[in-house]
From Swiss-Prot:
The species this protein was found in: Bacillus cereus (strain VD014)
Biological process, per Gene Ontology: defense response to virus
Keyword set, alphabetical order: Antiviral defense, Hydrolase, Nuclease
GO molecular function, a single term: nuclease activity
Role according to the record: Component of antiviral defense system Lamassu type II, composed of LmuA and LmuB. Expression of Lamassu type II in B.subtilis (strain BEST7003) confers resistance to phage SpBeta. May be a nuclease.
Name this polypeptide is given: Lamassu protein LmuA
Length: 355
């Protein structure tokens, strides 16, 4: 990701995350990031960053002037009650959020505090789906401002309208289920027709990618741009993951196609059995590792398409042989000879279908 669109980040120094590192909290952060990816996908160009600047950060790049939206997540078991405002103040939560005004005010659009249980102060409860800090009850707002006032720029900038509180329906028990529902809704909107197994594999692949981003450990001496590249994931990358899943699961190759178009002589029964099994197993293996195979699968597809375009005489059989010579040693998932052939055949048929 190019940070030149965000002038305030050019001198930004990555800071150590001192918040809770419990596995439940980290898992819920990942689910929340997935929600934002699914919600924004159809209408925004964006990059999401994990545990960098804040728990979750969205870099919006659709408009002429790109902006940043930050999310500080506070989560707890629903049975343990509300978030006490004084406890959050004691932990300097609001002062830490004000760091964004101090350092990236020119580029930040919104600064969210997200909780999965309501905020509580004395007998008052804050449980709004979305409310500006400046619209909170006066006594609650005064306590927040008192905490923020420890910032050296608060006297000049005050309580910004960029600060927003939001209560979300998320628990240790339901966040994954909600994320899967949101992904399935996106797949329906995008008219991506894949099996439940394939959708689960896609979900797990994205979850693994974001977990890797979240877990990347950096030195405080590292350049921020270097850190951001390791901690971020773009809409373009997610689109590639979706496209790969579509290609893996597209019905473009039948056994009759193999027998008729790719074999110069009748198959022996043993060979037929191997190819029939390979047709099922290669799809299963590709669905299990879509993030690992997506780059090589795209390379195979593009190479096949290029050869079809430039070589008027090449046949399907010859193109499979050519793909074997180029890609057999590059596929980094264990596939049998027949499974690799099926992968090549599928990409050839996809390239022919797309024209």
């Amino acid at each position: 990701m190019d940070i030149s669109s965000y002038p305030s980040l050019e001198t930004y120094e990555a800071r150590e995350n001192t918040g809770s590192r419990s596995s439940n909290r980290l898992a819920m952060q990942i689910s929340f990031a997935m929600w934002k990816i699914f919600e924004l996908y159809q209408n925004e160009d964006f990059t999401v960053a994990m545990d960098c600047i804040d728990d979750v950060v969205i870099f919006k790049t659709s408009n002429e002037n790109p902006t940043i939206v930050t999310y500080q997540l506070k989560t707890k078991d629903a049975t343990t009650g509300n978030f006490e405002l004084r406890k959050l103040i004691g932990d300097n939560v609001f002062l830490k959020m004000y760091d964004h005004i101090e350092k990236i005010d020119a580029d930040v659009e919104e600064i969210y505090l997200i909780t999965n249980n309501p905020l509580k102060f004395r007998k008052k409860t804050v449980n709004a789906e979305r409310i500006l800090f400046e619209k909170l009850d006066e006594d609650i707002k005064e306590l927040i401002e008192e905490n923020m006032s420890q910032s050296k720029v608060f006297a000049d900038k005050g309580l910004s309208s960029k600060f927003i509180y939001s209560l979300v329906d998320m628990s240790f028990h339901n966040h994954r289920e909600i994320s899967q529902y949101k992904l399935n809704s996106l797949l329906m909107k995008e008219k991506i027709d894949i099996s439940i197994t394939a959708a689960d594999a896609l979900f797990n692949a994205l979850q693994d990618i974001l977990t890797t981003k979240q877990n990347y450990e950096f030195s405080l001496q590292d350049e921020f741009n270097t850190v951001l590249k390791k901690k971020s994931y773009s809409k373009t990358e997610f689109t590639s993951l979706l496209d790969n899943s579509k290609k893996i699961n597209a019905y473009v190759l039948s056994f009759e196609d193999i027998r008729t178009n790719y074999k110069s002589k009748p198959l022996k029964l043993k060979e037929e059995s191997l190819y029939r099994r390979a047709m099922a197993s290669v799809k299963e293996k590709c669905n299990k590792s879509p993030n690992i195979l997506q780059n090589i699968n795209e390379d195979i597809f593009q190479y096949a398409k290029e050869q079809i375009d430039i070589n008027d005489e090449i046949t399907r059989i010859e193109l499979v042989i050519l793909l074997q010579s180029v890609f057999d040693d590059k596929i980094n998932v264990e596939l049998s000879k027949e499974e690799k052939e099926i992968l090549y055949m599928q990409n050839i048929e996809l390239a022919l279908r797309e024209g």
